[in-house]
Amino acid sequence: MTPETFPAPPYPWQQRAWHWLLGAYAGGTLSHAYLLEGPEGLGKLDFARRLAGTILCDEEPASSPCGACRACIQLAAGSHPDYRECAPEEGRSAILVDQVRALSAELALSSGYGGARLAILHPADALNANAANSLLKTLEEPVPGTVLLLVSARPAMLPATVRSRCQRVGFTAPGRDEALAWIGERAGGPEAELALAFTGNAPLRALDLCTQGIGELHESLSREMGELLAGRRDPVPLAEEWSTRDLALVLTWLAGWTGDLLRRRVPGAGRGAGLCRLDEASLAEVDAGRLFAYLDMVYEALVALRTPRNRQQLAETLLLPWAGPGRKPRVYAPGLARGTG
């Protein structure tokens, strides 16, 4: 941790999970591994860091990091001997096996201060196959006094053997009114509701979007997608145009737009948030059964942006499915030939 990443207070939508884990800590019943799972933008990493800070704090009993003891000062400086974070190295999208082996070797050492040892892996779904297998050995034979916190927005990408050896702590987005009230205390403005629609009520992601002029972007992207589906835009030049923008922000919008389309198109999927403005005739042409696979493609593209990639090619991959034969949008699953199935 650094002063910029020192644990934030638990957010209102995290209170239940916080009190449960705090009770386990106070009662001496903490598990050796937890999987903190839920959509992005809910503050799971903040939660993990605060829990680690509470456990390592010298104050007893600690219900939060005091911020003033030796342990808290070292955590803020990133020098605590009993705390580690494991994440993809700069320019990579995966956590590699050598990183996990090094982490496991450190956790096997005696505690620097005679207490617990904490490690956070984030995002845990970035573990490649070899790294996950290496971590599994640590999970199967935990070193006494160690606690592993795995943070993931896509837990299904983790091997079942890893998931089964962790206690799972689920995080869900707050209701719209609660999220809107929280953002209103910090940013407010007319774009707050739009930002929440972008992100599926994920307050932290929405708060970040409120500062990025998303209203104008929303109007532009909505118009472009409408023109693409109507056959008035070619996907390749449009992909080139998208690649010159903040592509992470564009794909965040596309994920929200697709989720809104899914809610409108699939019976029982819930009420749309107003991002997708397609008329009923256009909606009827969408292959609804493949929308889930397409949404996965968008999220995978967002992950791919962490590494040096051909941005235009990524955008083309996501736009071409909407310009299928006869200009009828066909959302297809990865690996399937277009126009089949």
Where are these regions (language model features)?
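Charged, glycine-rich active-site and insertion segments that engage polyanionic ligands
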Residues: M1-T54, A62, A71-Q74, P144-V147, ...
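Conserved alpha-helical scaffold flanking the Walker A/P-loop in AAA+ ATPase domains
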Residues: H19-Y25, A94-L118, A126, N130-T138
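Conserved catalytic network of the ASCE P-loop NTPase/AAA+ motor domain
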Residues: A26-T29, E59-S63, L75-S79, A108-G114, ...
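AAA+/P-loop NTPase substrate/partner-engagement loops
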Residues: S64-I95, A156
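ATP/adenylate-binding site constellation spanning eukaryotic-like Ser/Thr protein kinases
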Residues: H80, V100, A132, R163, ...
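Conserved Rossmann-like nucleotide-binding pocket used by diverse enzymes
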Residues: R84, I120, Q167
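Flexible beta-alpha connector loops of hexameric P-loop NTPases
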Residues: E89-V97, A124, R168-V169
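Structural recognition of the conserved hydrophobic beta-strand(s) that form the central parallel beta-sheet
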Residues: A119-H122, L135, T146-S152
